[in-house]
Design a protein with these regions (language model features):
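Conserved beta-strand-loop-alpha-helix junction that forms the acyl-donor binding cleft
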Residues: 118-121, 132-133, 146-158, 174-183
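Conserved acyl-donor/pantetheine-binding loop and adjacent beta-alpha core of acyl/acetyltransferases
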Residues: 79-110
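A short helix-loop-beta-strand connector motif used in the catalytic cores of GNAT acetyltransferases and
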Residues: 49-63, 81-85, 110
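Conserved GNAT-fold acetyl-CoA-binding loop/helix
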Residues: 28-50
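Conserved GNAT acetyl-CoA-binding A-motif
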Residues: 108-109, 137-151
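Conserved N-terminal entry element of GNAT/NAT acetyltransferase domains
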Residues: 1-17, 21, 25-28
């Protein structure tokens, strides 16, 4: 563990490129962990995941952890129509991410991306990013269904979210993604 003096900033759409490198690092990290179709990550990047997600969502929230003017972690959350989660994931085609009939409203909340540089893990940054994201998601009183999609092989992330109260719902893309839900 390193000695960190972290502060947190909301990343606006105008400043979105400040997390581009970390977003691409997330795709590389997920590929390194994957034991089911790691090649699926080959075409995933800031341009193919972050930008399209921001455009298709009704609301976006990005919070960055910053150490000495360097972004060392971020969390990206969305409020989007549930139909956004039908027919594909980034550059992949699949059935719906979840049973639409099980969702009470037309919109859902999602903790969509979450990444912390290796040297900054297990320092409390993840918990702070998670808590800030959940506070934002829960500020939408009409949204009762929250989802997190965890790539296969990322067991530490899966345990982290389960310890935060999310439950495994099901898998999609033949186990490539595990869907977690708040209820």
């Amino acid at each position: 563990m390193i000695d960190v003096s972290i502060h947190y900033e909301i990343v606006t759409e105008d400043n979105i490129f400040s997390i581009k490198e970390l977003c691409n690092d997330l795709m590389t990290y997920q590929k390194s962990k994957a034991n089911i179709h790691p090649e699926f990550f080959d075409n995933m990047s800031f341009e193919t995941r972050m930008i399209p997600s921001m455009k298709s969502s009704k609301e976006n929230y990005i919070v960055a952890a910053i150490d000495d003017n360097q972004v060392v972690g971020y969390a990206y959350s969305t409020i989007a129509p549930k139909t956004t989660y039908s027919g594909g994931f980034a550059t992949l085609q699949c059935d719906a991410f979840f049973d639409f009939d099980s969702v009470k409203t037309d919109d859902v909340g999602c903790l969509s991306q979450f990444f912390i540089k290796d040297n900054y893990r297990n320092t409390g940054i993840g918990t702070e990013l998670f808590n800030m994201s959940m506070k934002w998601l829960k500020s939408f009183e009409e949204i009762s269904d929250l989802f997190i999609f965890v790539s296969n092989g990322n067991d530490n992330a899966l345990k982290f979210y389960i310890n935060k109260g999310f439950k495994v719902s099901h898998q999609i893309l033949d186990g490539f993604i595990t869907v977690l839900r708040n209820r």
